[in-house]
Amino acid sequence: IDPADVEKLLELMREQQFGKLVAHAPYTMNLCAAKEDIRKFSKEMIADDLRRMDYTPGNYYNFHPGSHVGQGADAGIEWIAEALNEVLTPEQTTTVLLETMAGKGSEVGRSFEELRAIIDRVELSDKLGICLDTCHVWDAGYDIAGDLDGVLEKFDHVIGLNRLCAVHFNDSMNDRGSHKDRHACIGEGKIGLDAMRRVATHPLL
C-alpha cells in the first residue's frame, strides 16, 4: 500500500465528511473450519487485513463468523474465539464486526446468543462489534417486519446496542426463518418496503 495514496484517501474522506469505512472480509475465510490448514489460512488472512486496515485508523472490519462443518456450534464458537484471541491486538484501531448470519447450513452466528458467546470468550472484546444484516436476521427467524422494536430489545438484552456498529440493509427473497440467505432488492422481497423504511428511520439505528 502506497502511503501517498492512503493520505489522499484520508484527505478526501475529511473533505467529503465520510462516515466510517466498513471493509468486508473474503467469504472464503472460515475461522471455525474443521480442517486446521483452513483455520490457519483464515487467521493469517484476518491478521494481514487488520494490519492493512490500520492505514485508515478507526474504521470497521466485518466478517462472517464461519461454518462449523459438522463439529457443532459450540465447537465453532470456541474456534472463532480462539482465533480472535490470537489476531486481535491492544494497539489496533480497527473494530472487528461479527455479522449476524441466516443460519444456512452449519453457519455460526445464527442467533444473538451465539454471537454473544463468541464475544464473551474474547479477551480484547472491546475491539469487537456487530454488523446486523437485515436479510440474515429475517432468514434466521427474527421478525424485523412485524416486531422491529422487539428484535432490537432482544439484541440489546443479549448483546447490547452499544456494540451495534453497522447495518447491512437488504431485503430477503425468503420467508422468515427459512435459513437460506438469499438477498432481494430493497422493497422487492419478503421483508417489504414499509418494514425496510422503519429500519432505516428507527431512532435506535
Model-predicted segments: where are they?
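Long, contiguous hydrophobic alpha-helical segments, chiefly transmembrane helices and signal peptides
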Residues: 28, 46-49, 130-132, 137-138, ...
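Charged helix-capping and loop-helix junction motifs
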Residues: 2-7, 39, 43-46, 77-82, ...
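Metal-cofactor-binding active-site regions of metalloenzymes
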Residues: 19-26, 30-33
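Hydrophobic faces of well-ordered beta-strands that scaffold small-molecule active sites
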Residues: 21-25, 61-63, 96-98, 128-133, ...
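Active-site acidic/histidine proton-transfer and metal-coordination neighborhood
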Residues: 31-129
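Active-site beta-loop-alpha junctions enriched in small/polar residues
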Residues: 26-28, 66-68, 99-105, 135-140, ...
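Acidic (Asp/Glu)-rich catalytic clusters
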Residues: 2-22, 47-57, 85-92, 119-127, ...
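Gly/Pro-rich active-site loop or hairpin
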Residues: 108-116, 138-205
